[in-house]
Amino acid sequence: MSKYWSNITKNIEPYVCGEQPKNKKIIKLNTNENPYPPSPKVLQAIKNAARDDLRLYPDPNCDALRKTIANYYNLSKEEVFIGNGSDEILAFSFLTFFNPEETVVFSDISYSFYPVYANLYKLDYKLAKLREDFSIDINDFKNAKGGAVITNPNAPTGVYLSLDSVKQILEDNVNKVVIVDEAYIDFGGESSVSLIKDYPNLLVIQTLSKSRSLAGMRIGFALGQKELIKGLNRIKNSFNSYTIDRISSLAAIESIKDEEYFKECTSKVIKTRNWTINELGKIGFKVIPSKANFIFITYDTYEAKNIFVKLKDENVLVRYFNKYRISNYLRVSIGSKEEMVIFIDKIKEIINKL
């Protein structure tokens, strides 16, 4: 620990991301990436973007990308905010909408970045305890003094909250912002975007990392009424006006436009997810119902950590969380059908030997 560090730097507990192995032979099912490549139109746009105008700064407002996303969701361009991945937008949002003296509510089992942002900005927060089946009790979010954050579908559980429940939380917090983090919404859930016109306190955050196969380009976006977006821009422009580079912006536009490819890939992920759930059930695993591109699994008589280690020994990498209430669960990203067949074969071998 350096004597030059500030007190915040000394005391903060940073987010720990999933392992990124260098061994290309590993079947990587630990960070919820899409098993399929970006749209061919995206790859062509990237090639075309390698021009001499890269010497110039990009559009700080990302107008072309905002217009593309706005058209896709039947919103105005002024209701769209672009960020360097949804994580950056979440960080900006915590600073834009939440006050230190007011308690923000999010679930006790949810995205691990939320408490990091809260602690970084010295925000008070309350952890709403999920039920035993990992579902949200919406009463825990009623009259949140500082605002609320909901991951839908939730991570790492994959549990989806109905649109009616989201509406109720919005109506119970009309004077505070409710953030709905929809990183995984395209794998079977119904987005809250349709509620924006009726709820000025709703901010929906999505990413192109999962369903659009662009995790390597870091593009996220927020959707909400104009005043919320204005607030986000005030904070963004107090840090860095140029958060999105030219190439990423062009790639993102083509990704949004190629609806046919998007639907094809998400459909394959959903089909493979359902197949995997069925196969795991046959050998005694309990699988939490999922609307995401991952599943949350446990086996009553075997420790999850041991299964995690043995899978890793077999070059299959999944995610283990050594945390209260979920230490006997594994989160498994849905890979290609071929990868998931290998995963099932390996986990069968492990269970038979334990």
UniProtKB/Swiss-Prot annotation:
Family indicated by similarity: Belongs to the class-II pyridoxal-phosphate-dependent aminotransferase family. Histidinol-phosphate aminotransferase subfamily.
Gene name as annotated: hisC
UniProt key word Cytoplasm: no
Pfam family membership, one: Aminotran_1_2
EC number: 2.6.1.9
Upper lineage: Bacteria, Bacillati, Bacillota, Clostridia, Eubacteriales
Superkingdom field: Bacteria
Organism expressing this protein natively: Clostridium botulinum (strain 657 / Type Ba4)
Pathway entry: Amino-acid biosynthesis; L-histidine biosynthesis; L-histidine from 5-phospho-alpha-D-ribose 1-diphosphate: step 7/9
Reactions listed under catalytic activity: L-histidinol phosphate + 2-oxoglutarate = 3-(imidazol-4-yl)-2-oxopropyl phosphate + L-glutamate
Keywords: Amino-acid biosynthesis, Aminotransferase, Histidine biosynthesis, Pyridoxal phosphate, Transferase
Entry-linked HAMAP family: HisC_aminotrans_2
Listed name of the protein: Histidinol-phosphate aminotransferase
Keyword Transferase: yes
Subunit composition and interactions: Homodimer.
An annotated GO BP: L-histidine biosynthetic process
Annotated coiled-coil segments of the chain: none
GO molecular function: histidinol-phosphate transaminase activity; pyridoxal phosphate binding
